[in-house]
Amino acid sequence: MNRFLLVSLLAVLSISPARGGEADISGSVELQARAFWNDPQWVGQDDQALQGTVVSTTEIRWYNDDGNQRAAFIPYLRWDATDEERNLADLKEAYWAFEGDDYEVLVGANTVFWGVTESVHLVDIINQTDFAGDIDGEDKLGQPMVSLMLQRDWGEITGFVMPYFRERTFTGVDGRFRPPLPVDTDNAVYESSDKEKHVDLVLRYSHYIGDIDIGLNVFSGTSREPRFIPSADGQSLLPVYD
């Protein structure tokens, strides 16, 4: 993943404002706190009543003068005072995209969102959940990809090639939001012998008829939703990605 994201970053930086266009830069630093009124329930959990976290996000977006190219670079940093497994350095977005008359090509890392009205969060097909960030499952990790979108009168077809798999983040032994046994993310089990280097594919068709949106998806690859098995010593849970 690091090599792919490095290429993505170099591509983004090479499309600089010096070549024309417009760049928007913004950022934020958040101080977060979680308060716990009850004592820890499981062995190993930190017993402090207050858990502090610092989150930093920078957002850089560039658009060329012709309006057919854009780039984004959005690094995300999180540091937790109690649980080191919540520490995270991620690229939510780091891509370059070119838009033609009826197609679009995107290369890099991206966070894909297909709407909140669907019965299942289909974004989970593309992006992995940052469960250590928040237990509601809404926080996502950036996904390295190459995508091609074709626009036709009968609908929109988008294909995704994802050359690297992102493992789900989990709270560590010290964390309060965890199951009785902590999840051992260092010893994840994969069904595929390629492990995190397995190439995943997604094909999506979308269209609308009046006020009705239609979306059909075909996925081939490693599931973002792990199942769990106990470790050999019975002291932790191992995530299994099928």
Language model: regions and residue ranges:
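Sec-dependent signal peptide recognition
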Residues: 2-8
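Hydrophobic h-region of N-terminal signal peptides that target proteins for export
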Residues: 10-18
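Transmembrane beta-strand segments of Gram-negative outer membrane beta-barrel proteins
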Residues: 21-40, 69-73
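Signature for the C-terminal beta-barrel architecture of outer-membrane proteins
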Residues: 22-25, 101-102, 139-242
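Transmembrane beta-barrel architecture of outer-membrane proteins
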Residues: 28-30, 51-57, 72-74, 88-93, ...
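Surface-exposed strand-loop-strand hairpins of Gram-negative outer-membrane beta-barrel proteins
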Residues: 33-54, 236-238
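Extracytoplasmic loops and strand-loop junctions of Gram-negative outer membrane beta-barrel proteins
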Residues: 40-43, 76-78, 127-132, 183-189, ...
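Outer membrane beta-barrel
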Residues: 61-177, 210
